[in-house]
């Protein structure tokens, strides 16, 4: 199968949702010091009728414009929870992170939808992390906060994704029940040779530590990135230097080879 990026039409997304075109790949997240695998991030791929795989850029913008984002997110989360349940039954208790758009979190039925997916799959809420992109959080956050708080009370972790790319980071960290701060790759990859990026990176890690939440560095792509993450005290890392996104069976093989 080949991986290409070309935008789908609304009709193609509707048809694909009905035909189960969603294929999830999972990128490992590992402990920065031991490199032990602790979880994965679920990432969207879309399979066309001819077997071509499309990335999220071909699907998500159209889904957001056409009002299909909630249906797409529901399908992704349901698929990810079924996979999490399978891994748990096989003895692998990896945390699974799923991305959510702000429009998802303003839906009145979002908590029920997530509850249903957890109940049907039997996946444990404590192994689920909801990732919310910081730059997309709205000014009126009351409904989003309500949804996240309710899911946090059920045991799910809450991650602020792409930290450092928005404009109201401190206020959001103060108000939302975040358990994880995910530092944007723009401040991680190559930061060892860019003083301004390194300063932002270091401050973000320190902020997470002071708030008592986990820090995650994404975009770790070489040994220098890894060394910097370790020197700054980052908790978890993710990136091509560790592993590329993989289909579920490959994740298990990768973990076994590494003694996990």
Report residues per predicted region.
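EAL-family c-di-GMP phosphodiesterase catalytic domain
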Residues: 1-2, 32, 36, 49, ...
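Active-site core of bacterial EAL-family cyclic-dinucleotide phosphodiesterase domains
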Residues: 2-62, 99, 160, 238, ...
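Catalytic core of bacterial c-di-GMP phosphodiesterases, primarily the EAL and HD-GYP domains
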Residues: 34-41, 66-143, 219
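Hydrophobic side chains in well-ordered alpha-helices of soluble proteins
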Residues: 42, 59, 76, 80, ...
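Conserved long alpha-helical elements within nucleotide-processing catalytic cores of c-di-GMP signaling
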Residues: 60-61, 70, 149, 198
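Catalytic-core regions built around general acid/base machinery
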Residues: 114-117, 146-154
